A protein has these predicted regions:
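Extracytosolic ligand-binding ectodomains
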Residues: 1-340
Length: 340
């Protein structure tokens, strides 16, 4: 049987590091699980929506039963149209939840999952009131919307939501400081490289991280966040690093280079495709099999697909301190019923 990988193997005039990492991860999965079950058709979408559409059409015409990828949201939309017309499912790698749909599943690390985990954990730890300091970008928009939903569900009061243009956070920080005495948590869904500046501004404005628990997302699973003074003691949600570190060590041995962080998505998608081919017979890539509520185990932990194409992941909560992270709430190892 055949599955297809659609990835940006080339972009512009040259090869793509990300695309090469995804392709290598697919090869690793095939080699580690043993040959003979599937043939992977590798298709280059050139990082464009048109290229992705053409790649999907070629994959379907060559007999692919399942499409893995692509990476970019615009490409996922085009692949989804082709795949649905051919009654083929796709497991894509975009972080844009809007491109998920029935039959087009996202394996990526979604903002929504990070927000759900960290805000629910804060509520479990007795946090009652929260403020939000978020960049005015797509990531911030999704994070704020999801935080409001989780806060309503868990009973946390949202005392303030302040937005800022990336690189221009000072005024928003000042406004947050005015409610610092009324909150016990501050959620900042911004990237690690921004936090040195934002952190200094919070300190200058008098926001004490010893009194206000700082919360973040998997964007802080980055060395640049670990030595920011204002983030010492901060909590954030992310996959546990052990699985990726083990994968990366094997990858380095085989390819003499480091994988991109998202390489495990291609590895897990391929491993899943092979496992289902071996265990599920003709129904291997049906909706009922792919949306098994018990989920599946991958390099980054347990995950499952929802019928709407989104995913749920077992995430840990980590605390920053002294240039490293400590797991303070381990990722669940299974969903109800246990993973496949």
């Amino acid at each position: 049987m055949k599955v297809a990988l659609i990835a940006p193997l080339t972009q512009g005039a040259g090869p793509s590091v990300v695309g090469a990492s995804l392709r290598n991860a697919v090869d690793m999965a095939v080699n580690e699980t043993g040959p003979g079950d599937i043939t992977v058709l590798v298709k280059d979408d050139h990082g464009t929506a048109d290229g992705a559409r053409a790649a999907a059409q070629a994959a379907v015409s060559e007999g692919a039963e399942l499409i893995l990828g692509p990476l970019f949201a615009s490409s996922v939309r085009e692949v989804g149209r082709v795949a649905k017309a051919a009654n083929r499912p796709a497991i894509a790698f975009s972080t844009d939840a809007s491109v998920a749909s029935r039959g087009v599943y996202l394996l990526s690390f979604l903002v929504e999952s990070y927000v759900d985990r960290i805000v629910e954990f804060a509520a479990q730890k007795g946090k009652k009131s929260i403020a939000v300091l978020a960049p005015e970008n797509d990531y911030g928009n999704v994070a704020v919307g999801e935080m409001q939903s989780v806060a309503a569900r868990t009973g946390i009061r949202v005392m303030a939501i302040e937005r800022y243009r990336p690189g221009a956070s000072q005024d928003a920080v000042k406004r947050i400081s005015q409610v610092a005495g009324q909150i016990d948590a501050l959620f900042i869904p911004d990237q690690a490289e921004s936090m040195n500046v934002v952190g200094k501004q919070l300190t200058t404005a008098g926001v004490d991280p010893k009194k206000v628990q700082i919360l973040g997302t998997g964007l802080w699973n980055d060395a640049r966040a670990l030595n920011v003074p204002a983030l010492q003691g901060a909590w954030f949600a992310a996959p546990e690093n052990a699985g990726f570190n083990a994968f990366a060590a094997r990858y380095r041995t085989k390819y003499n280079s480091d994988p991109t962080r998202i390489a495990t998505l291609a590895f897990d998608a391929t491993t899943l495709a092979i496992a289902l081919a071996r265990s599920q017979g003709p129904a291997r890539y049906s909706e009922g099999v792919l949306t098994n509520p018990s989920g599946f185990n991958g390099a980054d932990g347990v995950f499952r697909f929802k019928p709407d194409g989104l995913n749920e992941r077992g995430l840990s909560v980590l605390q920053i301190g002294a240039g490293s992270t400590t797991v303070i709430s381990p990722a669940p190892r299974s969903f109800a019923g246990g993973p496949t």
